[in-house]
């Protein structure tokens, strides 16, 4: 083969690879502020891009209401990492496919500051409690904990769980409902009660993501703990591992959304 033919073949091969690659938007539920979300999860999207040959682009939402409304439109989020109730919602109503989940389970904790002198959740009726807005799992747990509309705390709605905690530390809220894993980072917080555990967050894919790309992402996630690149990614995002899962794991959790505006 002459040099000209080799060069032509090389560029044709590159063009073929470029034609096969695609860009997919990856969003994470806005539990953290957008800048912290990027810092926390860019190692994951970079890893998936390297492993799949596609451009997995991290996008963020400023708050849960914006996230919820954008998600329901079904046109902007190709890949989503979020909680059990919204994962099940998309599986049931939007034909998403669950690819893998973070290992373990997760709960929420109702916390106060160390000087609040609160011993039971009912003592927060009529008092200020900070939480991300509906339909975050935290807010749904608050509503579940205080079902009587006449005997509820005064909700201080915030954009993310860090803001919830800061409201308590700054004395602008008596309590807050936050993911239990965050509580350990703040020794000033006192846990009043912890909710039932649910399956941990999962990554699900829109019907726009081809089956072969879904499989490539799934394989990259569940095998991450077995490779140096995957182990580095897991350490960077502070996840123990990803594990295989199915729709059955999340079946029924969408019922937590009943009564939510827009459900």
Predicted regions and their residues:
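General small-molecule cofactor/ligand-binding pocket signal
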Residues: 57-59, 156, 192-193
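Bacterial N-terminal signal peptides that target proteins for export
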Residues: 1-10
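A ligand-binding cleft/hinge motif common to bilobed small-molecule-binding domains
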Residues: 81-93, 165-197
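Extracytoplasmic small-molecule ligand-binding "clamshell" domains
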Residues: 22-86
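Periplasmic-binding protein-like
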Residues: 22-31, 37, 104-112, 181-225, ...
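Bilobed "Venus flytrap"/periplasmic-binding protein-like clamshell domains
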Residues: 22, 26, 31-47, 107-166, ...
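Acidic, polar ligand-binding/catalytic clefts
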Residues: 61, 65-123
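N-terminal signal peptide c-region/cleavage motif recognized by signal peptidases
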Residues: 15-18
């Amino acid at each position: 083969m002459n040099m000209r033919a080799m060069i032509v073949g090389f560029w044709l091969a590159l063009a073929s690879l470029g034609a096969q690659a695609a860009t997919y938007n990856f969003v994470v539920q806005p539990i953290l502020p957008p800048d912290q979300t990027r810092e926390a999860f860019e190692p994951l999207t970079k890893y998936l891009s390297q492993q799949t040959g596609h451009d997995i682009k991290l996008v963020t939402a400023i708050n849960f209401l914006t996230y919820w409304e954008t998600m329901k439109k079904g046109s902007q989020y190709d890949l989503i990492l979020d909680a059990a109730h919204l994962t099940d919602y998309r599986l049931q109503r939007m034909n998403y496919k669950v690819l893998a989940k973070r290992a373990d389970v997760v709960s929420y904790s109702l916390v106060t500051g160390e000087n609040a002198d609160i011993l039971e959740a009912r003592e927060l009726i009529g008092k200020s409690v900070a939480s991300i807005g509906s339909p975050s799992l935290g807010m749904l747990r608050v509503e579940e904990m205080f079902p009587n509309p006449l005997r509820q705390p005064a909700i201080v709605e915030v954009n993310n769980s860090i803001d919830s905690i800061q409201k308590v530390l700054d004395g602008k809220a008596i309590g807050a409902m936050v993911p239990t894993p965050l509580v350990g980072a703040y020794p000033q917080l006192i846990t009043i009660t912890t909710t039932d555990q649910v399956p941990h967050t999962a990554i699900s894919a829109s019907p726009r993501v081809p089956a072969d790309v879904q499989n490539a992402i799934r394989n990259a996630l569940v095998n991450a703990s077995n490779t140096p690149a995957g182990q580095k990614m897991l350490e960077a995002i502070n996840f123990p591992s990803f594990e295989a899962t199915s729709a059955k794991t999340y079946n029924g959790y969408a019922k937590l959304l009943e009564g939510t505006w827009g459900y």
